[in-house]
Amino acid sequence: MTAAVKWAVSHRTIWRHLFPIQNGAISSACHKSTYSSLPDDYNCKVELALTSDGRTIVCYHPSVDVPYEHTKPIPHPDLLHNNEETHEQILRTKLEGNHKHLEQGPMIEQLSKVFFTTKHRWYPHGQYHRCRKKLNPPKDR
């Protein structure tokens, strides 16, 4: 109970500091406050305002433009003289090392890991399913 009273009193003093009330009315229809807990060099300037009816607090914080001199260009890697391995080079070396798997095809476990599927999807259908498949299905109307 006392904590709630202290909380209400502290918030009431903050409201009075931000938006002074004189004779039951707000001194300014749209009183602004530039109070900010952010550091001065932060890329945002916060402004608080109270609407004319006194029920809504409006917070406006536009981002500050950064001068061009303070920016850096995005480094683009040189693809011709790049010594780092690219994704394609890594895949090529893995596939070149596994000539056995290329001749008979990748194994079912590898296929399920590459395509994020279950292992059952890569097994062939049996004779029971193949003989019941309609070879000449009827055409749609």
Swiss-Prot record:
Record key words, sorted: Mitochondrion, Ribonucleoprotein, Ribosomal protein, Transit peptide
Pfam families found in the cross-reference section: MRP-S32
Gene Ontology CC annotations of this record: mitochondrial large ribosomal subunit; mitochondrial small ribosomal subunit
Transit peptide, UniProt annotation: 1-31
Protein's cellular compartments: Mitochondrion
Keyword Transit peptide included in the entry's annotation: yes
InterPro entries: Ribosomal_mL42
Protein origin, superkingdom: Eukaryota
Region forming the signal peptide: none
Family: Belongs to the mitochondrion-specific ribosomal protein mL42 family.
Subunit structure as annotated in this protein's UniProt entry: Component of the mitochondrial ribosome large subunit (39S) which comprises a 16S rRNA and about 50 distinct proteins. Component of the mitochondrial ribosome small subunit (28S) which comprises a 12S rRNA and about 30 distinct proteins.
Protein name, entry field: Large ribosomal subunit protein mL42
Organism: Rattus norvegicus
Organism lineage: Eukaryota, Metazoa, Chordata, Craniata, Vertebrata
